């Protein structure tokens, strides 16, 4: 395969809100360029994970190389990166954007600009992308291309008079998109003679080949048989195979500047492939690394514990493999008195957490218990040190803490104006502070500052239900602020259960304590003695529920006779119950853990 001249290469990604049709557009582009035969074509070619097909969302960024004979008579090579649209996978998006020079901004002509469209466009503009707006679903009766054009100009602030109007589903005007790519996006720059500099965009684990890495070549050339070096870790490897995705893997002799492809180098240690690292040649290394992208900082932490303690090592191994494939996921070992050995894991958000849990159970057959998600707090101690708190159970006594800071976010919510009232009420209930409120046509855009702790549990679900699914939501971290926070411990039979403790603002502590106690009362099975369920802040109990004892009629065998006979039996039973209360262990079923942690 000879090298394509730089002027004939276009690297682009597709950015859009969830469900605006970017994976379908990717399918049509692949079809139009004849990369797959009609028999191999299926819907959402690039969403290769079973989970992606099922939920209809893109989780992993995928890449494919297409050849397109344009109207000007030249044959172009197009490298497409399909990116996720959901806020929790923003890290995947930033990686794909770093590897491209331009983007297609897909907007649903019947729905208009959504919050995540906005967030991703700003990321693309930060990466100095040329952006081509595309209006999708123009075949729908509800499509209003003119209104959406005006909206793109007002809200996003990029000219949309030459936006390409298409329908990805029916294939209308796909040619127009390909022409716009070739005409309007810049060609990559690079020098084939310079030392090799390649950005490591992604890596994953293949059962046969070991670790495979996806790179975007900036300068230099990479061929089979080279010895490569990772600039961050200094690890060196012998390249067994270089190739491209057409979407199927196809090996090539070499990759030159501006191209995207994969390397297989028998990499066995997962830790050596840091996404965002620069790959260079061992014998003629580049002087400095490429600017990667900022490492992702986990926002939500939760504990994952194997139900069967023997699966602990298997869980460690599986998490390592997932970490390779998803660089925004972090984990460290921890132990819990109630649940045994497990891991404290960091995620970018709740959907991310759910997807990782689902992938662990599907791809690695693990049965797991997850504890309540919590955010990272900063504790300023009385001795002047600052500590991070990932797990509510580790919070020291209040006397040792000077103050606690909690993370805040800046949330952008876009919603039809008829649902604005309930949305604003929800935000203020969650201690939100309104920053801005603007109207574009019949839609409102509200910008709020909210404590992340209030958003973690079920904010997104509540937002969707009060707006009948119309509201869209996106957020960025917005620093830390001092707050009046307390740890609520849950005691069952006067024993604290560490996996159920959580941190809450003092104003809502009592209400949350009551609701968890009430839930546990319904979920913990009755014993032969009374069980007290309490919520406490320090030593002060703020809520209590009691589960009644199962009654056993010990006097059933007495017919008539003296009362002292019955009294003797009842006293004996009383004595036994007292002893049970002292030594009896209350088993909390797994379903109780899960249900208690879902906040209403």
Curated annotation (Swiss-Prot):
Annotated NCBIfam families: lepA (TIGR01393), small_GTP (TIGR00231)
Q: Which CDD domains match?
A: EF4_II, EF4_III, LepA, lepA_C
Enzyme Commission no: 3.6.5.n1
Describe the family membership recorded for this protein in Swiss-Prot or TrEMBL.
Answer: Belongs to the TRAFAC class translation factor GTPase superfamily. Classic translation factor GTPase family. LepA subfamily.
Q: What is this protein called?
A: Elongation factor 4
Question: Which GO biological process annotations does it have?
Answer: positive regulation of translation
Query: Where located?
Result: Cell inner membrane
Annotated catalysed reactions = GTP + H2O = GDP + phosphate + H(+)
Domain (tr-type G): residue spans on this chain = 7-189
Record function comment? Required for accurate and efficient protein synthesis under certain stress conditions. May act as a fidelity factor of the translation reaction, by catalyzing a one-codon backward translocation of tRNAs on improperly translocated ribosomes. Back-translocation proceeds from a post-translocation (POST) complex to a pre-translocation (PRE) complex, thus giving elongation factor G a second chance to translocate the tRNAs correctly. Binds to ribosomes in a GTP-dependent manner.
Q: Does the keyword Nucleotide-binding apply?
A: yes
**Origin, by domain of life?**
Bacteria
Record GO terms (molecular function): GTP binding; GTPase activity; guanosine tetraphosphate binding; ribosome binding; translation elongation factor activity
One term under GO cellular component: plasma membrane
Q: How does it sit in the membrane?
A: Peripheral membrane protein
Which InterPro entries does the entry link to? EF-4, EFG_III/V, EFG_V-like, EFTu-like_2, G_TR_CS, LepA_C_sf, LepA_CTD, LepA_IV
Q: Where is GTP bound in this sequence?
A: 19-24, 136-139
Q: Which UniProt keywords apply?
A: Cell inner membrane, Cell membrane, GTP-binding, Hydrolase, Membrane, Nucleotide-binding, Protein biosynthesis
State the organism of origin: Gluconobacter oxydans (strain 621H) (Gluconobacter suboxydans)
């Amino acid at each position: 395969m000879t090298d394509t001249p730089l002027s004939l290469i276009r690297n682009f990604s597709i950015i859009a809100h969830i469900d605006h049709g970017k994976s379908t557009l990717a399918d049509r582009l692949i079809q139009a360029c004849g990369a797959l035969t009609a028999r191999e074509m299926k819907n959402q070619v690039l969403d290769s994970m079973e989970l992606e097909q099922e939920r209809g969302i893109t989780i992993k960024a995928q890449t494919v190389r297409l050849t397109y004979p344009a109207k000007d008579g030249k044959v172009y090579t197009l490298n497409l990166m399909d990116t996720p649209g959901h806020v929790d996978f923003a890290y995947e998006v930033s990686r794909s954007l770093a590897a491209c020079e331009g983007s297609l901004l897909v907007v649903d002509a019947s729905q208009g600009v959504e919050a995540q469209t906005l967030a991703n466009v700003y990321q693309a503009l930060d990466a100095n992308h040329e952006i081509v707006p595309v209006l999708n679903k123009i075949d729908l009766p509800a499509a209003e291309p003119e209104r959406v054009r005006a909206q793109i100009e007002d809200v996003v602030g990029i000219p949309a008079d030459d936006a390409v109007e298409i329908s990805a589903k029916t294939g209308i005007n796909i040619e127009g998109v390909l022409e716009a790519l070739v005409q309007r996006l810049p060609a990559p720059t690079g020098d084939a003679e310079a030392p090799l500099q390649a950005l490591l965009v992604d890596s994953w684990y293949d059962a046969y080949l070991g670790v495979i890495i996806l790179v975007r070549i900036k300068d230099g050339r990479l061929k089979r048989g080279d010895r490569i070096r990772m600039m961050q870790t200094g690890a060196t490897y012998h390249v067994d195979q270089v190739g491209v995705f057409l979407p199927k893997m196809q090996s090539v002799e070499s990759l030159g500047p501006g191209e995207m492809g994969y390397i297989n180098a028998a990499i066995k240690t997962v830790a050596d492939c840091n996404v965002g690292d620069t790959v260079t040649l061992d014998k003629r290394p580049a002087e400095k690394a490429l600017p990667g992208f900022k490492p992702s900082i986990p926002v939500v932490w939760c504990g994952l514990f194997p139900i069967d303690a023997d699966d602990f090592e298997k869980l460690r191994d599986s998490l390592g493999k997932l970490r390779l494939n998803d660089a925004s996921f972090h984990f460290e070992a921890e132990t819990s008195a109630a649940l045994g050995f497990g891991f404290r894991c960091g995620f970018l958000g709740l959907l991310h957490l759910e997807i990782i849990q689902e992938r662990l159970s599907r791809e690695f057959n693990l049965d797991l218990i997850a504890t309540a998600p919590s955010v990272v707090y900063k504790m300023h101690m009385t001795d002047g040190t600052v500590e991070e708190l990932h797990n509510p159970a580790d919070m020291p006594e209040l006397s040792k803490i000077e103050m606690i800071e909690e993370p805040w976010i800046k949330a952008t919510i876009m919603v039809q104006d008829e649902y604005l009232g309930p949305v604003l009420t929800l935000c203020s209930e969650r201690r939100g502070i309104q920053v801005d409120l603007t109207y574009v046509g019949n839609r409102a855009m509200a910008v709020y500052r909210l404590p992340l702790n209030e958003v973690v549990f079920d904010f997104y679900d509540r937002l969707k239900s009060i707006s009948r699914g119309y509201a869209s939501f996106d957020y960025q971290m917005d620093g830390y602020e001092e707050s009046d926070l307390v740890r609520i411990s849950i005691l069952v039979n006067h024993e604290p259960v560490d996996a159920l403790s959580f941190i809450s603002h003092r104003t809502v502590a009592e209400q949350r304590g009551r609701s968890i106690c009430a839930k546990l009362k319904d979920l913990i099975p009755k014993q032969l003695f009374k069980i007290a369920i309490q919520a406490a802040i320090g030593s002060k109990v703020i809520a209590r529920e009691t589960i009644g004892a199962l009654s056993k009629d010990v006097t059933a065998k007495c017919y008539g006779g003296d009362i002292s006979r019955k009294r003797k039996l009842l006293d004996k039973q009383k004595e036994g119950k007292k002893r049970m209360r002292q030594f009896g262990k209350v088993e909390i079923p797994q379903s109780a853990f899960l249900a208690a942690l879902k906040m209403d």
